[in-house]
């Protein structure tokens, strides 16, 4: 895959010279993705046909949100994946007197130049450097080696110059850390490329006068399904009726012949837009979907925006980051869905009343209604022969039957993917998947809790409360008076068991459609 476009050559040269003048080091180009595509796919008579696409969508030439600042502990490194790249995020602010300075969020390749140990297992030191836990080498925010303790003093400076980390441009916008996954250009040049931000927050539609209340992503979640099936899911409002029965729809009364029409045609950089009976849909490349629901089963009819970044992390994995916008003037709590969303949005709309960790846990009720469906759907598509980045793949229309208007968003997205984007992400890693059924699709600990500062703190506090309650059982057994011993002991035991059961929601939450009456 090429990372340079001829028309940008002069601009990039100017930016590189400017970067050098400011003492910045241009980023090195990453290794070529193992599955890089140089063709796009179009559908002709139901068959996949490869055609030359010299200006196909460049997946590595765009900004992606990868984490939520509010849930990140700046005193430790955070492992993330993007397009098959293994990265580590960390904050280079110094700590003085126990107070961490604001600093900047940095993104390095999660691999120490010394012996390729994972930097995500390292430490952020008080001086704002990242220390590799394997041998103690340190790196500053630019990626330069700031300390190489094993080198003789006479050679240390020369050794350090040859030991820089591979770094990627970053920025913070709309409460999220964004990464530009192309080391071939400088950070300054990357910032010249606009990030696909939610336009309602920065450039409202003409004539629209909305006072948006905003909930930045409720929490980071990783799902073991294809990122493209997650995009497809967010472009499919009809699934709310059945898949989210009891929360966002009714499988028996809501399905009907909903109509949709295209309001903005599919294009490489512009994506597409649709409008219909269930609201409006917009796809913004590379991975943003915006849905404005406008039918009775969904909350805040016509006054809500669900903006979801379906971040492609690795083959068979996706990190959805959803920003929710609600018009402040919209009435509150008239339907079950609105009351449920009030809990989800509580830390923003009712500050101080609902802790942030509760919104994270509560959101799994809706998210896990999709989990098994998307995991199995992604594997079924592969089993049916749909692998659009590989030669000989069937077309989407060959493996799926979509005769109705309500699937128009999915059809438009698959057309964009095939015609303009080489069929999908050219992963920077091997695209082999783990055996089917080997992943825990209802996991909460590794998918969220372990790297969310709010939920991790809450889990630890609940653990302390549980242990105190368990200790009270022992104390009750030692009471000299037998009369209060039994009720006190039983109450303490019930409390300890109840807390432990609730803590299970931080570890795993399983959902069954069979049992969802």
Set out the residue ranges of the language-model regions.
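N-terminal chloroplast transit peptides
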Residues: 1-27
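Short beta-strand or tight-loop elements
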Residues: 62, 85, 166, 304-306
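Short, positively charged
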Residues: 55-60, 344-345
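C-terminal catalytic domain of Rieske-type non-heme iron oxygenases
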Residues: 96, 185-517
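Glycine-rich, flexible loop segments associated with nucleotide phosphate handling
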Residues: 7, 101-104, 161-164, 348-358
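Intrinsically disordered, low-complexity polyampholyte segments enriched for Lys and acidic residues
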Residues: 7-10, 22, 34, 38, ...
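Rieske [2Fe-2S] iron-sulfur-binding domain
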Residues: 37-47, 51, 57, 67-206, ...
């Amino acid at each position: 895959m090429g990372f340079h476009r001829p028309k940008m050559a002069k601009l990039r040269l100017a930016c590189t010279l400017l970067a050098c003048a400011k003492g910045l080091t241009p980023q090195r180009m990453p290794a070529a993705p193992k599955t890089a595509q140089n063709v796009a796919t179009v559908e002709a008579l139901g068959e996949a046909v490869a055609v030359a696409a010299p200006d196909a969508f460049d997946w590595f030439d765009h900004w992606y949100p990868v984490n939520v600042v509010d849930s990140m502990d700046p005193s430790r490194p955070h492992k993330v994946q993007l397009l098959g790249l293994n990265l580590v995020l960390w904050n280079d602010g110094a700590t003085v007197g126990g107070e961490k300075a604001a600093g900047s969020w940095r993104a390095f390749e999660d691999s120490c130049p010394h012996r390729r140990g994972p930097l995500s297992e390292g430490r952020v030191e008080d001086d704002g450097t990242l220390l590799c836990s394997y041998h103690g080498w340190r790196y500053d925010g630019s990626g330069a080696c700031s300390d190489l303790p094993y080198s003789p003093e006479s050679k240390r400076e020369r050794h350090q110059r040859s030991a820089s980390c591979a770094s990627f441009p970053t920025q913070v916008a709309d409460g999220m850390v964004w990464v530009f996954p192309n080391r071939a250009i400088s950070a300054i040049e990357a910032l010249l490329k606009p990030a696909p931000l939610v336009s309602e927050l920065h450039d409202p539609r003409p004539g629209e006068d909305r006072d948006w209340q905003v909930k930045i992503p409720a929490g980071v979640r990783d799902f073991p399904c294809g990122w493209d099936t997650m995009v497809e899911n967010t472009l499919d409002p009809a699934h709310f009726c059945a898949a989210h029965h009891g929360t966002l729809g009714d499988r028996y009364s809501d399905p009907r012949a909903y109509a949709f029409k295209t309001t903005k045609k599919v294009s490489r950089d512009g994506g597409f837009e649709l409008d219909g009976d269930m609201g409006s849909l917009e796809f913004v490349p590379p991975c943003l979907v915006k849905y404005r629901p406008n039918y009775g089963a969904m909350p805040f009819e016509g006054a809500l925006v669900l903006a979801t970044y379906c971040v492609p992390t690795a083959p068979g994995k996706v990190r959805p980051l959803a920003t929710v916008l609600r018009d402040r003037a919209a009435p509150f709590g008239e339907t079950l869905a609105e009351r449920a969303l009030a809990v989800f949005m509580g830390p923003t709309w009712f500050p101080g009343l609902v802790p942030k960790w509760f919104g994270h846990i509560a959101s799994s009720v809706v998210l896990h209604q999709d989990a098994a469906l998307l995991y199995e759907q992604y594997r079924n598509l592969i089993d049916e022969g749909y692998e659009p980045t590989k030669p000989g793949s069937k077309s989407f229309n060959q493996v799926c039957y979509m005769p109705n208007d309500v699937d128009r968003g999915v059809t438009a997205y698959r057309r964009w993917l095939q015609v303009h984007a080489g069929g999908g992400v050219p992963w920077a890693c091997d695209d082999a998947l783990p055996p089917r059924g080997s992943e825990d699709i209802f996991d909460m600990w590794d998918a969220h809790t372990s790297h969310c500062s709010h939920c991790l703190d809450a889990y630890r506090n609940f653990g302390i409360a549980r242990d105190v309650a368990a200790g009270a059982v022992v104390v009750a057994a030692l009471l000299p008076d037998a009369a209060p011993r039994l009720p006190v002991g039983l109450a303490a035991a019930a409390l300890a068991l109840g807390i432990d059961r609730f803590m299970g929601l931080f570890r795993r939450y399983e959902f069954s459609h069979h049992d969802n009456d």
